[in-house]
Regions:
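Bacterial N-terminal signal peptides that target proteins for export
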Residues: 1-9
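N-terminal intrinsically disordered, low-complexity, charge/repeat-rich segments that act as generic
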Residues: 2, 21-22
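Hydrophobic helical h-region of N-terminal Sec-dependent signal peptides
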Residues: 10-15
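C-terminal motif of bacterial Sec signal peptides marking the signal peptidase cleavage site
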Residues: 16-20
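Compositionally biased alpha-helical segments
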Residues: 22-146
């Protein structure tokens, strides 16, 4: 019986490992450059469909691909999607996660929404307090629709 439990645990671990989200990194200077010169006058309206089939319209920055690097430092262009999650770690090692297409960036702050269901609650992080930026596809069933 213990062999069956061990075998099941190994299989579950392997499934989790193979299906886990791949994390990429955005150097802070690169992040600032990718948003440089953008302001709210450039926002475009998009419509997303959620896992329950619901549709939501909102405005987002017109970024189609995000320049980032993999764990080995190789450059990668990640296609923007509503399921992308961006994780900021500040100088105190506090982590904040936003949906990438629901962030806004100005000269001093990154603002974002942490939930697609309660979009009225926003949070701000000072740009100069950001130590690392990670981005990954959370594999949540959100997609852009025309």
């Amino acid at each position: 019986m213990t062999k069956a439990i061990l075998f099941s645990a190994v299989i579950l671990g392997l499934i989790f490992f193979l299906s886990s989200c791949k994390t990429y990194y955005i150097p802070v200077d690169s992040f600032k450059q990718q948003f440089a010169g953008m302001d709210t006058s450039q926002l475009k309206e998009v419509t997303t469909r959620g896992p329950m089939g619901d549709k939501v319209k909102y405005k987002t920055f017109p970024i189609n691909f995000i320049k980032c690097v993999d764990k080995n430092g190789n450059p990668v262009e990640l296609k923007n999607s509503p399921s992308l999650e961006i994780r900021f770690t500040d100088t105190n090692n506090k982590k904040t996660i936003f949906y990438f297409d629901l962030i806004s960036v100005d000269e001093t702050y990154v603002s974002g929404v942490q939930s697609r269901f309660i979009t009225s609650i926003k949070k701000k992080i000072p740009l100069n307090a950001i130590k690392t930026i990670e981005i990954q596809d959370g594999k949540k069933k959100f997609s852009y629709v025309e």
